[in-house]
Amino acid sequence: MPTINQLVRKGRKAVQEKSTAPALQKGFNSLKRKSTDLSAPQKRGVCTSVKTITPKKPNSALRKVARVRLTNGIEVSAYIPGIGHNLQEHSVVLIRGGRIKDLPGVRYHIVRGTLDTAGVANRMQGRSKYGAKRPKDKK
């Protein structure tokens, strides 16, 4: 417990919050080849590898993950949501923030239905999250 005199001299230090998606906080100036502070809701990147990972202890599955090199030069792991995907090496993808709780080190999601990523086929509910188009009415 500090004394009043210590508080008058130094004061309290505000705790700085850490970002949950730090790769989205950095930009890149290609002319000056310098990284800049530029927050963005999504970022574009190129897949360097696509693989499956097993989750942490109580869960069991093969989760689909892509390693993505972003336009700011940072390389991150991003989860591929939905059933089935068409991604491979050199696919151009859009990533957003959002971690996968049972995959350590995976802090980003790939946005389905944009750039080279196809939407989920035969998806009827929650279509907007998976980039699926509205099905034609059968009459």
From Swiss-Prot:
Keyword set includes Chaperone: no
Keywords, alphabetical: Methylation, Ribonucleoprotein, Ribosomal protein, RNA-binding, rRNA-binding, tRNA-binding
InterPro entries per record: NA-bd_OB-fold, Ribosomal_uS12, Ribosomal_uS12_bac
Region feature Disordered, mapped onto this chain: 1-21
GO cellular component labels: small ribosomal subunit
Single GO BP term: translation
Keyword field contains Lipid biosynthesis: no
Residues bearing the modification 3-methylthioaspartic acid: 102
Pfam family for this entry, one: Ribosom_S12_S23
GO molecular function, one term: tRNA binding
Subunit structure of this chain's protein: Part of the 30S ribosomal subunit. Contacts proteins S8 and S17. May interact with IF1 in the 30S initiation complex.
Family statement drawn from the similarity comment of this UniProt entry: Belongs to the universal ribosomal protein uS12 family.
Function of the molecule: With S4 and S5 plays an important role in translational accuracy. Interacts with and stabilizes bases of the 16S rRNA that are involved in tRNA selection in the A site and with the mRNA backbone. Located at the interface of the 30S and 50S subunits, it traverses the body of the 30S subunit contacting proteins on the other side and probably holding the rRNA structure together. The combined cluster of proteins S8, S12 and S17 appears to hold together the shoulder and platform of the 30S subunit.
Protein name, as recorded: Small ribosomal subunit protein uS12
Organism: Alkaliphilus metalliredigens (strain QYMF)
